[in-house]
Curated annotation (Swiss-Prot):
PROSITE patterns for this protein: RIBOSOMAL_L2
Family: Belongs to the universal ribosomal protein uL2 family.
Keyword Ribonucleoprotein (UniProt): yes
Protein keywords: Ribonucleoprotein, Ribosomal protein, RNA-binding, rRNA-binding
MF terms (GO), sorted A to Z: rRNA binding; structural constituent of ribosome; transferase activity
Compositionally biased tracts (Low complexity): 36-48
Lineage, highest ranks first: Bacteria, Pseudomonadati, Pseudomonadota, Alphaproteobacteria, Rickettsiales
Protein name, as recorded: Large ribosomal subunit protein uL2
Subunit structure: Part of the 50S ribosomal subunit. Forms a bridge to the 30S subunit in the 70S ribosome.
Keyword RNA-binding: yes
GO cellular component, one term: large ribosomal subunit
Disordered as annotated region, ranges: 30-54, 223-274
The species this protein was found in: Wolbachia sp. subsp. Brugia malayi (strain TRS)
GO BP annotation list: cytoplasmic translation
Compositionally biased residues, Basic and acidic residues: 263-274
Amino acid sequence: MGIKFLNPVTPSSRGTVLVSKIGLSRGKPEKSLAFGKKSSGGRNNNGRITIRHKGGGHKKKYRIIDFKRNRNDQGVVEKIEYDPNRSGFLALVSYKCDDTKSYILAPQGIKPGDIVMSGSGIDILPGNCLPLKGIPIGSFVHGVELKPGSGAVIARAAGCYAQVVGRDGNYVLLRLRSGQVRLVLSSCKATIGVVSNPDRKNRKLGKAGRSRWLGVRPTVRGVAMNPVDHPHGGGEGKTSGGRHPVTPWGVATKGKKTRKKNKFSDKYIKQLKG
C-alpha cells in the first residue's frame, strides 16, 4: 500500500498526502457480512449532542468482524479490503470445510492466498491467533483479549501492536504503544503481527471537504464563542480567553491527569504510559 502525493494541479490537491489503495479489492463487501448503518450525527437517544464534530459524510456499511477467532480449522485469505468504519484494512477469510467466510483485521504483510489459523500450538505467523502463553517473548501482537473468550479489545487500530515482554505466573506482560506495561491472563488470545495501514498517520487531507466526506464537522475555537457556550467565550474584541485552557466543561486541557484514582485495573498495570 504506502502513501501517494497528489500533484498540485488545484489548490486543494497541493500538499495532499493520501493512503494508496493499490492491492486492495475494488469490489463490494461480502453481502452476508455487511449491513446498513444509520449515522447518529453524534446524538444520543434524546437527540442531544454527546459527541461533538460528527455528522454528514458518505453512507457506510458496517462489516461484521470476527474478533473472537474461535475456529480451529485453516482459512484462506481471499482478498484485502478497505473498511470505512476503522483505520486498518480487513482480510476476507474463506473456510473450505463448511464454505463459510469471515472478516478479520488484516495484519501487515498478509496477502491473498495466505493461510491463517487459530488455536494452540500453531506456527507464529502473521494472522495466526493463539493464546498468549504460546507466543514467544519479544513477539509483536494485535487484537489482544482482556478476558478469555471476550474478543479482541487491545491494539486494533491501523499500525497498532503490543509486545510480549515477559511472564508472571498465569499472566503475560504486554508493552502497549503508549508505553504502558500491563498484565494480561496467559489464556487470553492475541493475533500475531502489526495491524495493517501504518502510513495512515502520515496522511494530509488537503481540504475541509475531505473531512466532511469522512463525517467530521468543523471544530470551533472556544474564544470565538459566547460566554454561555464556553469558558473562554465573550470579552471585548479579540481576547485570548483570560484563563488556562479548559474544555467546554471546565476541565484543564494541558497536562491534567484524567484517569480515575483507585481504578479496578490499577493492580494489572505495572508501568504507566511512558
